[in-house]
Amino acid sequence: MSQVIKKKRNTFMIGTEYILNSTQLEEAIKSFVHDFCAEKHEIHDQPVVVEAKEHQEDKIKQIKIPEKGRPVNEVVSEMMNEVYRYRGDANHPRFFSFVPGPASSVSWLGDIMTSAYNIHAGGSKLAPMVNCIEQEVLKWLAKQVGFTENPGGVFVSGGSMANITALTAARDNKLTDINLHLGTAYISDQTHSSVAKGLRIIGITDSRIRRIPTNSHFQMDTTKLEEAIETDKKSGYIPFVVIGTAGTTNTGSIDPLTEISALCKKHDMWFHIDGAYGASVLLSPKYKSLLTGTGLADSISWDAHKWLFQTYGCAMVLVKDIRNLFHSFHVNPEYLKDLENDIDNVNTWDIGMELTRPARGLKLWLTLQVLGSDLIGSAIEHGFQLAVWAEEALNPKKDWEIVSPAQMAMINFRYAPKDLTKEEQDILNEKISHRILESGYAAIFTTVLNGKTVLRICAIHPEATQEDMQHTIDLLDQYGREIYTEMKKA
């Protein structure tokens, strides 16, 4: 029977020009890698953002799905020139917007290898060594957090999925089907939007999400937090979770984790930390003390595709007690009975939402093995220094206001000539952002702090230099003065 099947396969492939045999596949991969590496080698000289014009999008729309295939090299070349070229390059050293994704080439290699083997990493028996590696990495990361008793976790696509996974465990640990409608959750006015979205998905409506004000350092005000908790308890609600942040998206601020933990313990609440950005600082010998208190949480989210230099998407959710994830996500349908494991050798489909999932943790393990944690820690510390260099470049400049000083590789500032109104200053800073984006030299967007439109830099690329920071600030100053003059003439 097997010979018949083999014969049919060979018959199908004979004369079929567009089926890739091993030689064609090798040639296509070599060609792509050569072109990609040549592009990456000259990255400092390339624009950070290349915008696609309408006619270029129209050109792509004209490429219909063919009935007959095309040569692979033709399509790959088309993608390189017409698709990948037009993007905001989060791997560029001067991409300072959002939280950049400066992926290590080692992670990229790991991604290629894992994709080539197309591993199903949902169950330990399907890929036992993959499961072993992922669990060992998660245990090591949990140790850095301070989870030591019975920790565990799972690799997910990003912080949004990590947060909703942890929040599901929090709901199931502290609420029941009967009192779910009374549960209240507490975030700050600087908490990432994915947290509120996740709370809504698990059944906590906006009317039961409390947004706690922050102090002058953009940290959650724990006095206001306890007042809100006490008020809700008196009103018959059930406060069940507080979400603190280790590295807010706007300013890099770290909430008072130890104080929040004490309040959660006092009121029998789950304490989750959104560490998507800042948890990586735990690998920095110099700065890890900034995150004192992470080990007091019940769960934490952590994005490796941010400050651990991984390709998208690679993130983790870690819990102090893995049984909480198992309680929320374990199912045992008939088609998985042959693969069922116990809690000591858990299948990842029993501790997270995904059944079929890629082996996201292998590239992180490869990166840790090749680079070592010391080098990664140094790269993280370099990000802190980049923000300091930006602040030092700003200080002597006239009419610039630092709104949030350098911390956690971030800084917020604005051009604020005193003869302009606040509204005019807001417009001016928006125009400065647009102009530097148009220049292609750096990517810097605005955000809003204390009601002011500000320019925000998040600088975590290990290859960014002091010269990059100085020239970026010089350009912003130049554009600010030019636009100011244009506005006064208008």
UniProtKB/Swiss-Prot annotation:
Compartments (UniProt record): Cytoplasm
Activity-regulation annotation: Inhibited by (S)-alpha-fluoromethyltryptophan.
Gene Ontology annotations for the cellular component aspect, listed alphabetically: cytoplasm
Record flagged with keyword Cell membrane: no
Listed Gene3D superfamilies: 3.90.1150.170, Aspartate Aminotransferase, domain 1, Type I PLP-dependent aspartate aminotransferase-like (Major domain)
Function: Catalyzes the decarboxylation of tryptophan to tryptamine. Tryptamine is a neurotransmitter that induces the release of serotonin, which is suggested to modulate gastrointestinal motility. Therefore, the tryptophan decarboxylase from the gut bacteria Ruminococcus gnavus (strain ATCC 29149 / VPI C7-9) may influence host brain and behavior. Has weak activity with tyrosine and phenylalanine.
Names of required cofactors: pyridoxal 5'-phosphate
Catalysed reaction equations from the record: L-tryptophan + H(+) = tryptamine + CO2
Keywords: Cytoplasm, Decarboxylase, Lyase, Pyridoxal phosphate
Subunit (UniProt): Homodimer.
Family the entry assigns: Belongs to the group II decarboxylase family.
Species the sequence originates in: Mediterraneibacter gnavus (strain ATCC 29149 / DSM 114966 / JCM 6515 / VPI C7-9)
Molecular-function GO terms, alphabetical: L-tryptophan decarboxylase activity; pyridoxal phosphate binding
Claim: Lyase is one of the keywords in the record: yes
Main location: cytoplasm
Protein name per Swiss-Prot or TrEMBL: Tryptophan decarboxylase
Name of the top EC class for this enzyme: lyase
EC numbers: 4.1.1.105
Top-level taxon in the UniProt lineage: Bacteria
Listed InterPro entries: Aromatic_deC, PyrdxlP-dep_de-COase, PyrdxlP-dep_Trfase, PyrdxlP-dep_Trfase_major, PyrdxlP-dep_Trfase_small, Pyridoxal-P_BS
Modification sites for N6-(pyridoxal phosphate)lysine: K306
One annotated GO biological process: L-tryptophan metabolic process
Pfam families: Pyridoxal_deC
